[in-house]
UniProtKB/Swiss-Prot annotation:
Name recorded for this polypeptide: Pyridoxal 5'-phosphate synthase subunit PdxT
UniProt GO molecular function: glutaminase activity; pyridoxal 5'-phosphate synthase (glutamine hydrolysing) activity
HAMAP family attached to this UniProt entry: PdxT
Family classification: Belongs to the glutaminase PdxT/SNO family.
Record EC number: 4.3.3.6, 3.5.1.2
Amino acid sequence: MTQKVGVLAIQGGYQKHADMFKSLGVEVKLVKFNNDFDSIDRLVIPGGESTTLLNLLNKHQIFDKLYNFCSSKPVFGTCAGSIVLSKGEGYLNLLDLEVQRNAYGRQVDSFVADISFNDKNITGVFIRAPKFIVVGNQVDILSKYQDSPVLLRQANILVSSFHPELTQDPTIHEYFLAM
């Protein structure tokens, strides 16, 4: 069965995710409106700026549709996308997870680091990245950086504090497709 991956395209780094999936031969739909959710099988919520993203979700009146989709279908949130999926006032509250925004520093403090995932070294690009600070027992820690979780999964939801779409390595995107 052919999968169609939606990439939320109202703000942030959605194009790099779309390009990564296209390089894997996957059909991609840029999601901007409520009816766009009806034609996709899974969704990526990209990085960007979480407050702006939340404001736009409400302004475009797609917050509720996004919540319903993420409650049952595979979803991958990177950086700001992970924040939106976590616990917090005005967030989707779909993960047993609390985050600290910009915990790894400001834009000038961005960095690249090797992390281990499924017995493979991958590159993590951390740009104003959140830190996953309270992880519930329903959440599986898939990867860490300096003893802090940076890649997590809870049921149908995958989140990363880093940006795998900014590398040439499709490992994390392939994992998401297999969920």
